[in-house]
Amino acid sequence: MDGRIPDRSGSISTPVEQRTWLIVPLYNEAQVVRGVIESARQTFPKVVCVDDGSSDASAAEARAGGAVVVSHPINLGQGAALRTGLDYALGDPDADYFVTFDSDGQHRTEDALHMVRMLDSEPLDIVIGSRFLDNRTKLSPIKRVVLRLGVVFERMSSGVKLTDAHNGLRALNRHAAESIVIDQNRMAHASEIVAEIGRNELRWAEAPVHVLYTDYSKSKGQSVWNSVNILSDLFLK
């Protein structure tokens, strides 16, 4: 099974971009999310944002950008938002592929499209973006060390030998999206997804991606806090 369904009303002849949903967790990103969605929809017209209890105008800005918005009444965490978004997108019978995509401008649609095309042309269930397959992504020393530690721990715990275990840019076919169970609401969902790849014996590959650490994301202290969250995930799970 390659994730495509040959007898489904000619879906194979439909451009891959139109058979893909972007799943975008959203929390207090009103400043940038409209531009991110408008840019992404130039390639992928189907975008669902899960507003995870934002206290700003994130939901309105995402809608203005052309996304479908599903809202959590309170902040549940990124894992919960991904689960809600995948559940929504799986309800589209014409959808073959699902991409988890950040709302703050760090992910590039060019990378997402390459990953989806890999799913469409190769016997794969899931493609994980990696910042370590080339030198385009500029990482701080502490971030690089933490991510390398994450790789070691994930290999030991799941047997899945990724080079970048905590990259949020992922492309899944329908089989993978239906098979992976996300019970961890917050940052531990990243490790959970890797474990689910091993548990379900999903066919996986990595693709080089360029993650853009912008002035905006740095101003929020995201890189530092993500490193702390990853360490907490590794040692407390």
Question: Predicted segment positions?
Answer:
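N-proximal low-complexity "stem/linker" segments adjacent to membrane-targeting elements
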Residues: 1-39
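Short loop->beta transition adjacent to catalytic acidic/histidine clusters or analogous donor-positioning motifs
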Residues: 17-21, 39-48, 57, 67
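Conserved sequence signature across two-component system core domains
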Residues: 26, 50-53, 72
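Acidic helix N-cap motif at the loop->helix transition within catalytic regions
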Residues: 31-35, 56-65
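A conserved acidic beta->alpha catalytic loop
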Residues: 51-60, 105
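Acceptor/aglycone-binding surface of glycosyltransferases and processive sugar-polymer synthases
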Residues: 68, 73-88, 97, 109-187, ...
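Short beta-strand-to-loop acidic/aromatic patch adjacent to the donor-nucleotide binding site
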Residues: 94-104
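Catalytic donor-sugar/metal-binding loop of nucleotide-sugar-dependent glycosyltransferases
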Residues: 161, 182-185, 194-212
